[in-house]
Amino acid sequence: FIAGTRVAQIDGTTIYADRNSTNGSSATSQTIRFLGPTTAYTSPASTKSILVGGTFANNTNNSVNLTLEIYDSSVGVTSTGSVAIASKIPVPAGSSFVISDTGKTVLESGDELRIYCDSTNAIDASLSILTGVS
């Protein structure tokens, strides 16, 4: 499945996703890991914040894939409620991924920065955020 695919329904032993797989072979008898997002930051109520930059360090001995997403709280949980700002970025063991300060991301009241990783507890995040913007 491509990045951003979500489980739409679980019916007994069958799992349905919100889009088709790019894999043409059968997926029976395979192990599936359900790793959800970690909300790294939520913009405070009645104000805006600006994501200036961030460093996401791999603290494991294996390469991991990282996805960063902005959840727009004004839209809610829909297919348009989240926008990936980095999708399936490979982060080698002992390395990091950096969001540079060349582009800023405005977070409105209640918006969230979410981090997805394909391994549990594999990423340490350090964020630079300007808060209290009106």
Where are these regions (language model features)?
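Short, charged beta-turn/beta-strand-edge "cap" motif at the junction between a beta-strand
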Residues: 1-3, 103-106, 119-121
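Small/polar beta-strand repeat architecture
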Residues: 1-37
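General beta-strand recognition
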Residues: 14-16, 65, 124
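Generic structural detector for well-ordered beta-strands
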Residues: 6-8, 16, 41-42, 90, ...
